[in-house]
Every structure is written in C-alpha cells, then in structure tokens.
Amino acid sequence: MDDDWRRDVGTSWQWLLVALTIGCAVAGGLFPLIDPDLAMHLRTAEWIMQEGRVPYAEPFSWTRPGAPFYAYSWLAELLYWGAFTTAGALGLHLVHAFTAAGAFLTVVALGRGSRWTPWATLLVALMSFAIWIAFIGAVRPQALMGLTVPLSWLAAEWMVRGRTRAGLLLAFAMAVLTVNTHLLFPVTAMPVIRMLVEPRPQWRTAALFCVANGLGWLMTPYAFEFVEMMRINFTGNALIGPQTIVSELEPGFRAFGHAAISIRIATIILLLVPFAIPGRLLTDRERILYGLLWVGGLFLFGTAVRGLVIWLLAALPLLARAAAAIPLPQQPINRRVTAVATLLVPLGLLGSEFNQQADVPTLTATRATRQLPSPVAVVIEPLARFAECRLGVTRGARAYTVFNYGSYLVWRLPAFSYSIDGRNIYPDSVAGAEAYQTAYNGPMQLGPWRSADVAIAPLQHAVARALDAAPEWQLLRVSRAEKAEDGEAGLWAQRTWLATRGITAPAADTVRMGRNLPAPGACSAP
C-alpha cells in the first residue's frame, strides 16, 4: 500500500500528510467560537456537573415546566465544559483543532483501509474537511460526527476484509460515541451497505455490524427514551418546517440560492457525483445500493440544509470512485505541483478564518466572566451587566426573550428562567413568535411576554413596541452596538416585580458598545 503512495504521490507522501493534518488543525483551531448554541451546551454541561446526572425534564425554561428534555449531546458537552473550565477559550480552540485534524485523518484512514487510490483518498479527505469546516465549522457536537462516521465506514471495511473482531469493536465504539453526541446517531449504521454490495452479499457480517451498532446505541442514559426524544425534536413545531427562521433547518434547495459559495459548490459536486463515475468502476449492485444511500442523503438535504453533512458521509464511497476516475499526474514535477496545490486547501480555509475573526467580539471568555464571543454578545452584554448589578436577580425570575438571544442568556445569566432559547422543542404558543408569520396566520403572535418578570429583546422586534405601550412595564436600559449589523436591544421589567423587590429603577439610559467588550468588574459602577 505504501508503494502505491510513493509511486502516485511521491517519496515525501508522509510529510505531505503531516503538513495537511497540521493545516487542518490550525484552520479548525482558529475558527471563531461563534456557534449560537455553544453557550447552551456549556450551560447544560454545567447543570449536569452540578446535579450529578443528565436531565430528563426541562431544567431552564418556565414556558415548558416538567416537559421532557434530553441532553443527548451530553458527552460532547462535558468535553467542551472540561476544556473551557480548564483553559477558557484556548481550551475550546485546542479541542476543535484536534477535532479538525481528526476529521481529515479519519477519511485518510478510511481511504487506506478501503484501498482507494492515494489521490482519491487525498481528494475525498480534503473535500470532506472543506465541507466539514464550511458547514459545521464552529465548536459544536455535530463536528464529532466527522470523525465517528468515517470510522464506522472503516469498521465495515475491516469486517468485509476478514478483520471481524476489530471491526465489531470499532463499530461498537463509534456507535457509543455518536449516540451520546448527536441526535442523528443512526447514521453509524449506514456502512452496512458495504457488506451488501459484495458479489456475494455478506448477510451474516451485515447482521453482526447491525448488532454492534444496536448495542452501542443502548450505551446511553436515554436508551429507553429514544421514541420520545425523536418525537419532541422532529414532529410538528413552528420552528420545524417551511416557516422556520433557523438557517440550518431551512429546506436545502431553498437555502441554495443564498448559501455560501462553498456550500453551493459542495451541493453541485454531490449532485453530480453518481453521474461522473465510469461504468467500469461500479458493479450494478454497487450502483444500486450506493445510489439508494445517495438518494437518502439527498432527501435529508432537501428536508433541511444541515443534511448536507449526512449526505456527504453517505456518499463517501461514490466520491472515492469519482475521484479515482480523475487522470493522475504522471510526471514527477506534475506530482510535486499537485501535492503542493493540495496544501492550498487548508491554507485557503485558514484565510477565511482571519476574515471571520475580524467580526468576532473581543472579550474575556472564562467561566468567571461567563462571556462568549457569540454574535449577540455585543448588544446583550450591557443589559446582562445591568441585570447583575441593579436587579439583584434571584433564581427563578421569569425572563421573556427571543430565540436568537436565549442560548447566550441561559449561560450568561443563569439565575433567570427563560421563555425560549436556541432549541426547537417549544410549544407553538412560545415558538410561534419566532416563525415567519403572514396575515393568513391571524393576529401576530408575540409569545408569553405578559407572564414574564423581565424582558430582553431587540428593539426592532414587535414585542418591544408592545412592552413600551404597556403601562405595567418599564424600560430600564437600551443597548446599541456601534456597528448597525450588531443590532440594538432593550431590558424591561414589570413595575410590580420591581416594587416587590424594593428596586427603584432609574430612567432608561442608552449604552453604546463596540466589539471590544470589557470583562465584568465590580458592580459599584454598572
């Protein structure tokens, strides 16, 4: 196998892999910590550490008391929590650097284990990584699927080639990691197709592979909650379906028109890949079964754009065959030029990282400050600081907020109980205000703001006008970002709630905040 790499790539092929791995690690490690749900993941991990167990009922929101809540990503959340509490933002960047390197290396390992051609292995690994960082990018549990699913394919390959025990152990381990990392854990069973495309289908091996996955899926505290867990996350909800404002839940082909150029290119490649493979490189059985898997990935992408990653992982064997059909560079000088060109992929991604870094708030992200470089941090921080210092918040106060603010606030001001956060499991009476609405929907839904004690919302939101018009509410502070795209928000409180707490609220003032956010200090000068 190594002889193939020396012949096709060159005698320095190992150094090329090292350089590409380092480039991918750096590109991943420098990616900004801007995922909107990172704050929610850290808060969930904090709750698990405090309680010593995973939650089964709603722990954060007053709008769904006692309703089921499953922290199905608890393993990844604890990993991020450990890194953050140990080394702050640097710890999260380091974890992501290793994850990014793993997303590249696991596909390389799959290619070598599957006897793909060296250049097919490199091309598929780089394309997989490019889609991984373009679509997932930030620190989030879904990123770990870029490691576990390729290794599930490798486990299937080992079993087909006679390494049954090693394949079973690897398949079981990847199923355990994935079921405790992401809701779409059944994708680890996709590689069972590998046993069925053989000229004589290996039914016994396929059954063993499925058993290994099934046993792995049971290794979770939510093993007996799968049906309910799927129900509350995938059934009818205002934030699931055509009205959603959640970008990753938007139907894939609707999102295509305004998606990033990298997502459009990846979509076109995946659409064309079955038709780019010469007939001699696929048997009829492979064309049918791998094609069905490709269609399944296409369906998931059509349902929600976040299905793009699953579509990619389902299409790995087809991508390898398509890449193998590309003519290889024959002359040594051409091989060297091609090898150097592959290094431009992580370098190009690295350049895009620096562009994104320019738009990230500068702050002190530690457990003590509870700040995170979320896109909404710039406008929320002055309001959070005011609430800490002037409202003397005790646990249980009801806060009304909006979908885009909720996840950050759950982490930043954990004493409040919030009406909504970044999860799509809320009843329509709450989530309806966050979905697209038309005149055919009847009166505009604003959510349960009248039942809250305080409210934090964008000034351009319709609820802000309702709060200003309601005599029982008082505006306490306005936060305006220096850059218009960062928005403006307000903090309101019920007058009776303020009175019962003995708080005499001052007249509302306005704070302008740039992207250089100071760490919270003493409350003497809020």
Label each region the model flagged.
Residues 332-391, 404-406, 413, 424, ...:
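Membrane-proximal, lumen/periplasm-facing interface regions of secretory-pathway glyco-
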Residues 412, 431-489:
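Periplasmic/luminal catalytic loop of GT-C fold multi-pass membrane glycosyltransferases
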Residues 63-90, 94:
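Short hydrophobic/aromatic helix or loop-helix immediately within or flanking a transmembrane segment
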Residues 94-114:
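Transmembrane-helix motifs of polytopic, lipid-linked glycan transferases
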Residues 388-430, 452-459, 492:
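Short periplasmic/luminal acceptor-recognition loop of GT-C membrane glycosyltransferases, typified by
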